[in-house]
């Protein structure tokens, strides 16, 4: 299974991401991955600007190679992106000039979509023609592969099918036997497989979510042009 992550029109394969992460973000010879994170850190938003501090914090985690923290925050960013897009879309260009108070200008919409789960809100994005059918399917895929398992402590299908090598030997014998084992029956193997998956794909997932954010922000600006 090959993952392809899209960031600002450029596709990053899993091989590229794995190679760069394994080389180490902090090494001087590895410039491209650092530039990608810096580029993400410098994301410019207008309508979805409240998301910028979260984007910056995730970038900080990536520089420190804190991948499990990265996935947790990216899942929160994903869900908040969807909710805020629905909030601003439904508000339809509302500003303080329309007679609303600063502290409750979007109160109705925040209460409405804040109570719904991610899957429901993605469906609403599609029904409102805010996203295409392809984008809908991709967001559902990201929800099932990243958000659900890493927010609920469950496993995605890739971790479920993961295997690892175990080596067996006996006292008095020079023979070492290699065994291929599944990971789901032992907590140490299972959690290590989860961490390995995120080390390999967490950056690509984050970059793709930021790409969606910038695209949605651009579309929302059409409603808030005044």
What does each model-found stretch correspond to?
Residues 18, 113-114, 141, 145:
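Intrinsically disordered, low-complexity sequence elements enriched in Ser/Thr/Gly/Pro
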Residues 115-133:
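...with weaker cross-activation on analogous glycine-rich loops/strands in unrelated enzymes
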Residues 129-226:
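Charge-enriched, short contiguous segments at helix-coil
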């Amino acid at each position: 299974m090959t993952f392809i992550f899209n960031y600002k029109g450029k596709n990053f394969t899993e091989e590229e991401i794995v190679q760069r992460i394994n080389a180490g973000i902090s090494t001087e010879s590895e410039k491209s991955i650092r530039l990608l994170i810096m580029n993400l850190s410098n994301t410019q938003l207008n309508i979805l600007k409240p998301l910028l501090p979260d984007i910056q914090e995730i970038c900080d985690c990536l520089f420190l190679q804190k991948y499990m923290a990265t996935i947790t925050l990216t899942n929160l960013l994903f869900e908040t992106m969807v909710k805020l897009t629905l909030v601003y879309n439904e508000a339809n260009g509302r500003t303080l000039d329309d007679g609303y108070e600063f502290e409750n200008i979007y109160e109705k919409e925040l209460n409405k979509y804040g109570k719904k789960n991610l899957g429901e809100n993605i469906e609403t994005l599609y029904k409102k023609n805010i996203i295409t059918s392809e984008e809908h399917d991709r967001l559902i895929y990201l929800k099932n592969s990243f958000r659900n398992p890493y927010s609920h402590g469950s496993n995605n299908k890739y971790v479920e099918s993961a295997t690892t090598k175990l080596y067996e030997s006996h006292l008095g014998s020079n023979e070492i036997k290699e065994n291929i084992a599944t990971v789901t029956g032992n907590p140490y193997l299972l959690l290590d497989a989860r961490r390995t998956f995120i080390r390999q794909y967490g950056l690509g997932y984050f970059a793709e979510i930021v790409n969606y954010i910038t695209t949605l922000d651009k579309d929302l600006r059409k409603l808030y042009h005044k």
